């Protein structure tokens, strides 16, 4: 009898779980869902803020048709009862003068029938689990209205300078949302702050280090992610935001503003708006800011990618550490984070001799916060391997291969790891560049020789004093099948030094050099093969 009861309970639980997963909210963006009304432009989305009380809900039912909001926003927090035996419940953050607050369950039941997108703002750590449990239970309950419109779960998880509120723990928020409501869009933002207009300009931008910190929470999520960014911050963070939008996963932005936002240079915002598809950015702006963008041109502009997602395959190995160790790909370049456990394999087949191949790019080194003055592994940097067989790779540590290395401290070298009873070849060639955060490079593989040209490069808004270039080369054994080598890119050395390849290209180029040089190269190859 007991076994039968347990079986029935297990089956019913599984049924509810499957039912809930089938009926969860659509993953479509708000812009795509209201495509006819918005004309595919996130600037045309109308948001109803602070719908937290019964009167607010009634107003939503009677709003003018031509000015109808497309998304309802509500704020949830925990209300504790005076009597300890009564547990705290999630309620909406309405005017404190109201005697009876509306609970989150009641609010959800009402807004689910209004045919609008729903944005739920989590205002504390305590409210995360119970609200997500209510959302899950509502979709597993056949009597509850089905959420057929986009649902956005928002929390301010990053602390701002001069913050006036406590941030929600990002790990708890992301993990609970992934487990209990995986089809919602996760929205991450920064805490509210006082006197924003008086902040130093350095606090009004999103740095690359901050961006990498964000990746720790979103890089492995399967569900859509939205980053809520202040307009003034976005105006100074165009490159970082374009990099995020270029990731090979569903990432969008919500740009918001209030009266404290004073934008003096609109060019980055306009370029951001015109450089991406219009449905990737939502705008929740102060009327004066919205009016400016509505009058400005929004014709798309072509921004060629600096990295082809189709040409490179990511291969990851497990890491023993707790920190994020991976490679995150974007059309604006790949980022290598944490331990050196990830590789990028070029899908472009190596050419035949006498053709040559080139690997070019720009690397931006970013030591983790607080690690700038610590003694770091001198072998930390980016490695480009030229390999005969990529099928032999069974770990992130590649051996018996030709390696081209650019270090974070400016050290460059070419190492010949293929030498076996070949005393006529040098083992390595080394060089040194001046200290810089960014270096440009071009590797030329001619089959019998590899050359590296490397130089100091500009980083962001930092002006380069003088470009310095160093070139090194190394003669290498040549394969008897006349194929050049496969290309693999990886991180090497210390986990405290992350880097972004702002540019990375692999090209096969036919040899257009002097014909006599080609003839001599062919003769040398024939002698080697004899």
From Swiss-Prot:
Subcellular location as annotated: Cell membrane; Secreted
Major localisation: membrane
Keywords: Cell membrane, Membrane, Neurogenesis, Secreted, Signal
GO BP of this protein: dendrite morphogenesis; dendrite self-avoidance; positive regulation of dendrite morphogenesis; regulation of dendrite extension; regulation of dendrite morphogenesis
Gene Ontology, cellular component aspect: extracellular space; plasma membrane
Span of the signal peptide: 1-16
Effects seen without this gene: RNAi-mediated knockdown results in reduced arbor complexity in PVD neurons. RNAi-mediated knockdown at early L4 larval stage results in terminal branching defects in PVD neurons. RNAi-mediated knockdown at the onset of adulthood results in defects in PVD dendrite structure.
Superkingdom in the source lineage: Eukaryota
Annotated membrane topology: Peripheral membrane protein
Entry's family note: Belongs to the menorin family.
Assembly information from the UniProt record: Component of a signaling receptor complex, at least composed of transmembrane receptor dma-1 and ligands mnr-1, sax7 and lect-2. Within the complex, interacts with sax-7 (via C-terminal domain). lect-2 enhances interactions within the complex.
Function, in words: Required for stereotypic branching pattern of PVD somatosensory neurons. Induces and maintains tertiary branches in dendrites. Acts through the neuronal transmembrane receptor dma-1 with cell adhesion molecule sax-7 and lect-2.
Protein name (Swiss-Prot/TrEMBL): Menorin
Organism the protein comes from: Caenorhabditis elegans
Gene: mnr-1
């Amino acid at each position: 009898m007991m076994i039968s009861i347990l079986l029935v309970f297990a089956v019913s639980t599984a049924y509810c779980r499957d039912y809930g997963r089938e009926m969860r909210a659509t993953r479509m963006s708000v812009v795509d869902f209201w495509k006819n009304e918005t004309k595919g432009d996130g600037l045309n989305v109308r948001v109803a803020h602070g719908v937290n009380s019964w009167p607010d809900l009634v107003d939503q039912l009677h709003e003018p048709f031509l000015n109808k909001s497309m998304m309802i926003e509500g704020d949830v927090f925990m209300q504790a009862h005076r009597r300890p035996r009564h547990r705290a419940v999630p309620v909406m953050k309405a005017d404190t003068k109201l005697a009876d607050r509306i609970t989150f369950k009641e609010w959800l039941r009402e807004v689910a029938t209004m045919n609008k997108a729903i944005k739920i703002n989590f205002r504390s750590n305590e409210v995360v689990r119970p609200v997500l449990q209510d959302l899950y239970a509502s979709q597993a309950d056949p009597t509850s209205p089905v959420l057929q419109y986009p649902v956005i779960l928002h929390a301010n998880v990053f602390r701002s300078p001069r913050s006036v509120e406590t941030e929600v723990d990002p790990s708890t928020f992301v993990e609970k949302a992934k487990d209990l409501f995986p089809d919602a869009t996760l929205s991450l933002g920064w805490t509210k702050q006082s006197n924003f207009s008086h902040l130093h300009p350095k606090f009004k931008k999103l740095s690359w280090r901050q961006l990498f910190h964000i990746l720790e929470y979103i890089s492995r999520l399967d569900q859509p992610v939205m980053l809520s960014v202040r307009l003034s911050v976005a105006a100074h963070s165009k490159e970082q935001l374009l990099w995020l939008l270029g990731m090979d996963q569903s990432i969008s932005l919500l740009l918001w503003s209030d009266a404290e936002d004073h934008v003096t240079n609109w060019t980055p915002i306009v370029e951001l708006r015109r450089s991406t598809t219009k449905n990737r950015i939502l705008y929740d702006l102060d009327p004066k800011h919205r009016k400016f963008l509505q009058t400005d041109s929004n014709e798309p502009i072509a921004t060629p990618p600096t990295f082809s997602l189709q040409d490179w395959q990511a291969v990851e190995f497990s890491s023993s550490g707790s920190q994020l160790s991976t490679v995150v790909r974007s059309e604006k370049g790949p980022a290598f984070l944490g331990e050196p456990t990830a590789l990028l394999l070029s899908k472009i087949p190596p050419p035949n001799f006498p053709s040559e191949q080139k690997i070019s790019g720009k690397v931006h080194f970013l030591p983790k916060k607080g690690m700038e003055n610590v003694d770091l592994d001198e072998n930390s940097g980016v490695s480009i391997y030229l390999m005969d067989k990529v099928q032999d790779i069974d770990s992130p540590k590649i051996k018996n291969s030709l390696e081209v290395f650019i270090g974070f401290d400016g050290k460059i070298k070419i190492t010949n790891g293929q030498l076996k009873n070949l005393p006529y070849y040098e083992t390595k060639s080394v060089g040194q560049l001046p200290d810089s955060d960014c270096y440009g490079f071009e590797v030329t593989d001619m089959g019998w020789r590899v050359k590296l040209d490397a130089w100091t490069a500009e980083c962001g808004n930092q002006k380069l004093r003088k470009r310095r270039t160093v070139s090194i080369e190394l003669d290498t054994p040549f394969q008897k099948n006349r194929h050049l080598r496969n290309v693999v890119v990886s991180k090497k050395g210390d986990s405290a030094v992350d880097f972004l390849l702002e540019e990375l290209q692999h090209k096969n180029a036919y040899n257009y050099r002097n014909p006599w040089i080609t003839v001599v190269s062919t003769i040398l190859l024939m002698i080697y093969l004899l």
